[in-house]
Amino acid sequence: MATLILADLHLSADTPAFNDAFLRLLNAAAGQIDALYLLGDIFEVWLGDDDPAPFPRSIISALHRFATSTPVYVMHGNRDFLLGPRFARESGATLLADPTLVELHGHRYLLSHGDLLCTDDIAYQRFRRTIRQPWRQWLLRHLPLALRQRIGQRLRQQSRTAKNDKPLYIMDASTEEVGRWLLEHAGSTLIHGHTHRPGHHRHVLTNGTLAERWVLPDWRPGQTGGLWIDQNGVHPAPDPLYDLQTHTGNQTR
């Protein structure tokens, strides 16, 4: 069996096609893969575990059913960093620190959402350090939901405006920071999302060694992919539901 890694699904009540694709994937893959890793921004927005909106309930219930047979690991993204203990309990998922070093099928992988690598975006990194402080997160979680919704809308609008004003390279992973991480975790392969620029990169580190980095695809019309990991390494998963047949031997369509 293989391990499946996804990120940047950005699921919401406004993405019924993606929600359905994810639910079908969970149903088909349960018990058929070693583990599922979700490396952040699974949800377009997460305002707290107490949000009673009907949309996330279907995803949480499906994750819980899936987790009874297959481990699920979830990392916070910049959109859903308020995922908390109640979400973990109700979904059956294990929340991961960012970054997290794991060993899968005999190989070491350094997993991250990816926003920490974008160090050229100084304004965003300053905001991230501020908003991720534990006392600020506690305060956010205890604000009235209606106020959190207004704050969330404002932050998303500010994010869209900021992206339009920034050069593309600023919002990409810094090669220098990538190299620093890979040196610190020698012998590992880095896997991350966030940048929405899927690809496979080889880096020559300052000590002369070679290292690999895989960038996960975001989900968008015509693109609902991820990465498979097995004993032979990392493989693109352009259509994980269809790919299950290859990696498990089971027909899914």
From Swiss-Prot:
Binding site for Mn(2+) 2: 41, 78, 113, 194
Annotated binding of substrate, by residue: 78-79, 121, 159, 163, 166, 194
Gene Ontology MF terms in the entry: manganese ion binding; UDP-2,3-diacylglucosamine hydrolase activity
Record-level GO BP terms: lipid A biosynthetic process
UniProt membrane topology term: Peripheral membrane protein
GO CC, alphabetical: cytoplasm; extrinsic component of plasma membrane
Cofactor note: Binds 2 Mn(2+) ions per subunit in a binuclear metal center.
Pathway: Glycolipid biosynthesis; lipid IV(A) biosynthesis; lipid IV(A) from (3R)-3-hydroxytetradecanoyl-[acyl-carrier-protein] and UDP-N-acetyl-alpha-D-glucosamine: step 4/6
Enzyme Commission number: 3.6.1.54
Binding positions for Mn(2+) 1 per the UniProt entry: 8, 10, 41, 196
Catalytic activity: UDP-2-N,3-O-bis[(3R)-3-hydroxytetradecanoyl]-alpha-D-glucosamine + H2O = 2-N,3-O-bis[(3R)-3-hydroxytetradecanoyl]-alpha-D-glucosaminyl 1-phosphate + UMP + 2 H(+)
Cofactor requirements of the protein: Mn(2+)
EC class name: hydrolase
Keywords assigned: Cell inner membrane, Cell membrane, Hydrolase, Lipid A biosynthesis, Lipid biosynthesis, Lipid metabolism, Manganese, Membrane, Metal-binding
Cellular localization per UniProt: Cell inner membrane
HAMAP family associated with the record: LpxH
Homology family: Belongs to the LpxH family.
Role played: Hydrolyzes the pyrophosphate bond of UDP-2,3-diacylglucosamine to yield 2,3-diacylglucosamine 1-phosphate (lipid X) and UMP by catalyzing the attack of water at the alpha-P atom. Involved in the biosynthesis of lipid A, a phosphorylated glycolipid that anchors the lipopolysaccharide to the outer membrane of the cell.
The protein's name: UDP-2,3-diacylglucosamine hydrolase
Species of the source: Laribacter hongkongensis (strain HLHK9)
UniProt gene name: lpxH
